[in-house]
């Protein structure tokens, strides 16, 4: 959520930023109108409450003097009724203002390129050379079924479309990837491992920006009023919600493996085969809570941490800066890492690393003190995939396939696979 002071102090700047996001800039005027209405109502209510207190004192004085106080009592009742109407109106204006503010995206960084779609993203780095096969290579969705690593058909029977059973070597490879990624982030990159709740309340979803704008993308447990998490970013970021963080805690660096649940609303017909777009998938997440002056370097560091995984796995990738039309709602700047997938003859997103600045911290009331006597300040929050496990799985199967239908295990994963170096067809 943006600071209301920005709207009051520099509305033209905000209109420019909002317009670059593809929103109608009149939303800034609508916020200012509600804000002015709110301030007028507060002023009127305070004046009436002061008058009520004055009349109350007069009533007490009249009673002490044994004078008739009926007119004053009637006046106080009328004031009370008027104050209630004002308070009710003020409460509704507060709701309307907060709802309006909660649907306005973060201010984009000056580095973010203007554009409408992912085709306008700017490539800033490329690592590795896509493999040239000397045989007819196969897509991962064919390879994993031939190797009996997955079962889509039975998953559809049990749960529906866009679910999968990982079986045998497939389950082992998925687990090996998660263990490897978590170990790398905790032992070499300085993150604290967390095991997170996978059901969270509406306040948590609001804090990280999924609610109210993106509710259709979520799965909800109606009876309990809880949501399945779309990413471990949600519980990790909310860990310090409504808290003032002690001076010696920052930077806070968390990593967690979790299942992620997404309805994929609006993605019908996209990536319908294989492991690229599922309703449930595993992901290793990185979350950082930083002092404002440190957050931009933290974004670079976190992106390098995700890249280190891809490089150790030997997977060609590129880094792009997301444009104004593709960047996420809460992000000020986002790098996407895209891994090479031969079946697409293209790069596909495998990680997003974003600086959310104080956007989530304001919604979640995450503050810190520079010393014990200092005034609390809003922290900056960042998040990044390190990595999406299913997409890494698919990339390994495609890039490490052999002519006989087997898949070589990347060297760095062999210890996590119990020493296994190749996954071979069982038939």
UniProtKB/Swiss-Prot annotation:
It catalyses: tRNA(Ser) + L-serine + ATP = L-seryl-tRNA(Ser) + AMP + diphosphate + H(+); tRNA(Sec) + L-serine + ATP = L-seryl-tRNA(Sec) + AMP + diphosphate + H(+). GO terms for molecular function: ATP binding; catalytic activity, acting on a protein; serine-tRNA ligase activity; transferase activity. Keywords: Aminoacyl-tRNA synthetase, ATP-binding, Cytoplasm, Ligase, Nucleotide-binding, Protein biosynthesis. Pfam families: Seryl_tRNA_N (PF02403), tRNA-synt_2b (PF00587). InterPro entries: aa-tRNA-synt_IIb (IPR002314), aa-tRNA-synth_II (IPR006195), aa-tRNA-synth_II/BPL/LPL (IPR045864), Ser-tRNA-ligase_type_1 (IPR002317), Ser-tRNA-synth_1_N (IPR015866), SerRS_1_N_sf (IPR042103), SerRS_core (IPR033729), tRNA-bd_arm (IPR010978). One of its GO terms (cellular component) is cytoplasm. It is an enzyme of class 6 (ligase). It is found in: Cytoplasm. Pathway: Aminoacyl-tRNA biosynthesis; selenocysteinyl-tRNA(Sec) biosynthesis; L-seryl-tRNA(Sec) from L-serine and tRNA(Sec): step 1/1. Its main location: cytoplasm. L-serine binds at residues 231-233, 285, 385. GO terms for biological process: selenocysteine biosynthetic process; seryl-tRNA aminoacylation. ATP binds at residues 262-264, 349-352. It comes from the Bacteria. CDD domains: SerRS_core. Its EC number is 6.1.1.11. Catalyzes the attachment of serine to tRNA(Ser). Is also able to aminoacylate tRNA(Sec) with serine, to form the misacylated tRNA L-seryl-tRNA(Sec), which will be further converted into selenocysteinyl-tRNA(Sec). Belongs to the class-II aminoacyl-tRNA synthetase family. Type-1 seryl-tRNA synthetase subfamily. Consists of two distinct domains, a catalytic core and a N-terminal extension that is involved in tRNA binding. Homodimer. The tRNA molecule binds across the dimer. This is Serine--tRNA ligase.
């Amino acid at each position: 959520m943006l600071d209301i002071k920005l709207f009051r102090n520099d509305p033209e700047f905000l209109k420019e930023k909002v317009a670059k996001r593809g929103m109608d800039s009149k939303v800034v005027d609508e916020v200012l109108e509600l804000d002015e209405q709110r301030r007028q109502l507060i002023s009127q209510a305070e004046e009436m409450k002061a008058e009520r207190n004055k009349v109350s004192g007069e009533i007490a004085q009249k009673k002490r003097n044994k004078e008739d106080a009926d007119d004053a009592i009637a006046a106080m009742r009328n004031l009370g009724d008027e104050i209630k109407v004002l308070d009710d109106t003020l409460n509704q204006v507060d709701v309307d203002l907060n709802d309006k503010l909660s649907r306005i995206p973060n201010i984009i960084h000056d580095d973010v390129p203007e554009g409408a779609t992912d085709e306008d993203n700017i490539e800033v780095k490329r690592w590795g050379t896509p493999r040239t096969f000397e045989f007819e290579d196969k897509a991962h969705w064919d390879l994993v079924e031939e190797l009996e690593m997955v079962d889509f058909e039975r998953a559809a029977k049990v749960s529906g479309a866009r679910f999968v059973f990982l079986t045998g070597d497939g389950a082992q490879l998925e687990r090996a990837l998660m263990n490897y990624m978590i170990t790398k982030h905790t032992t070499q990159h300085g993150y604290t491992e967390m095991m997170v709740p996978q059901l969270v309340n509406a306040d948590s979803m609001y804090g990280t920006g999924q609610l109210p704008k993106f509710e259709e993308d979520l799965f909800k447990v109606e009876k309990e009023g809880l949501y399945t998490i779309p990413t471990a970013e949600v519980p990790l970021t909310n860990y310090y919600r409504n808290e003032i963080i002690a001076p010696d805690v920052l930077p806070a660096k968390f990593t967690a493996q979790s299942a992620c649940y997404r309805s994929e609303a609006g993605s019908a017909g996209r990536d319908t085969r294989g492991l690229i777009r599922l309703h449930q998938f595993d992901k290793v997440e990185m979350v950082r809570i930083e002092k404002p002056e440190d957050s931009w370097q933290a974004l670079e560091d976190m992106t390098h941490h995700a890249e280190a995984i891809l490089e150790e796995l030997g997977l060609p990738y590129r880094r792009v800066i997301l444009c104004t039309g593709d960047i996420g709602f809460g992000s000020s700047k986002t790098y996407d890492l895209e891994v090479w997938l031969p079946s697409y003859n293209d790069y596909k997103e495998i990680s997003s690393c974003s600086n959310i600045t104080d956007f989530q911290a304001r919604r979640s009331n995450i503050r810190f003190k520079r010393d014990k006597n200092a005034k609390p300040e809003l922290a900056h929050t960042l998040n990044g995939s390190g990595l999406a496990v299913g997409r890494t799985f698919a990339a390994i199967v495609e890039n490490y396939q052999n002519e006989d239908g087997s898949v070589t295990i990347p060297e760095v994963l062999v210890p996590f696979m119990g020493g296994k170096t190749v996954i071979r067809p069982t038939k």
